[in-house]
Amino acid sequence: MELNTITPGQGAKHAKRRVGRGIGSGLGKTAGRGHKGQKSRSGGYHKVGFEGGQMPMQRRLPKRGFKSHLLKFNAEVTLTALEQLGLAEVDLLTLKQSGLVGQIAKNVKIINTGSLSLAVKLTGISATAGAKTIIEAAGGSIA
């Protein structure tokens, strides 16, 4: 078998249905759209979520909660990611350069996911209580 001899399986490819090309085709004249009405017109059909004039569902239900714009400035880094980084001293700049956090991140928190056997000194980075105990047990520190 060669790459230039491979063909699609039988019935895998379908010819595009051509509509509006004469009565002999079976889909001529109205082209499967029926007679008259909004759906038969070009560009004519309701927008998504329109319910025929009745109050739509997304307006009947109450608003709930909000999305904080501050979330994009806060980032989380796992202990496993910190281990894979393999650095003795870690700060916000090194995390940005390594690509672990985005460039717009202002605050970073180390979370207790995974394990850490490397002694890491963190500067300007916070950690959860569980992550803090693991970092200190491995010989690291948080400043």
UniProtKB/Swiss-Prot annotation:
Any GO CC annotation of this UniProt entry: cytosolic large ribosomal subunit
Keyword Cell inner membrane: no
Superkingdom: Bacteria
Keyword Ribonucleoprotein among UniProt keywords: yes
GO BP term, example: translation
InterPro entries: Ribosomal_uL15 (IPR030878), Ribosomal_uL15/eL18 (IPR021131), Ribosomal_uL15/eL18_sf (IPR036227), Ribosomal_uL15_bac-type (IPR005749)
Record key words, sorted: Ribonucleoprotein, Ribosomal protein, RNA-binding, rRNA-binding
Segments for region (Disordered): 1-59
Ranges annotated as biased composition (Gly residues): 21-31
Quaternary state and interactors: Part of the 50S ribosomal subunit.
Function: Binds to the 23S rRNA.
Similarity comment: Belongs to the universal ribosomal protein uL15 family.
Name this protein carries in UniProt: Large ribosomal subunit protein uL15
Provenance organism: Polaromonas naphthalenivorans (strain CJ2)
